[in-house]
Amino acid sequence: MTQIFLIGRLPEAYAPFDPIVDVLPIIPVLFLLLAFVWQASVSFR
């Protein structure tokens, strides 16, 4: 039961990093968009 709770929420020591952790899953999407913008800038060669 304690393990499930820890997975669901960060421990108290990492509480200041909670906003950063909320943003982390978006980073791969940003890389995908970056690749698209890069290809658009080189005219999809």
Curated annotation (Swiss-Prot):
GO cellular component: chloroplast thylakoid membrane; photosystem II reaction center
A family per Pfam: PsbK
Cellular location(s): Plastid, Chloroplast thylakoid membrane
SUPFAM superfamilies the UniProt entry points to: Photosystem II reaction center protein K, PsbK (SSF161037)
Annotated keywords: Chloroplast, Membrane, Photosynthesis, Photosystem II, Plastid, Reaction center, Thylakoid, Transmembrane, Transmembrane helix
Principal place of residence: plastid
Domain of life: Eukaryota
Coiled-coil spans in chain: none
Prosegment location in residue numbers: 1-8
Membrane-spanning parts: 20-40
InterPro entries: PSII_PsbK (IPR003687), PSII_PsbK_sf (IPR037270)
BP-aspect Gene Ontology terms: photosynthesis
Bilayer topology annotation: Single-pass membrane protein
Family per similarity comment: Belongs to the PsbK family.
Self-association state and partner proteins as the record states: PSII is composed of 1 copy each of membrane proteins PsbA, PsbB, PsbC, PsbD, PsbE, PsbF, PsbH, PsbI, PsbJ, PsbK, PsbL, PsbM, PsbT, PsbX, PsbY, PsbZ, Psb30/Ycf12, at least 3 peripheral proteins of the oxygen-evolving complex and a large number of cofactors. It forms dimeric complexes.
Function description: One of the components of the core complex of photosystem II (PSII). PSII is a light-driven water:plastoquinone oxidoreductase that uses light energy to abstract electrons from H(2)O, generating O(2) and a proton gradient subsequently used for ATP formation. It consists of a core antenna complex that captures photons, and an electron transfer chain that converts photonic excitation into a charge separation.
Protein name: Photosystem II reaction center protein K
Gene that encodes the chain: psbK
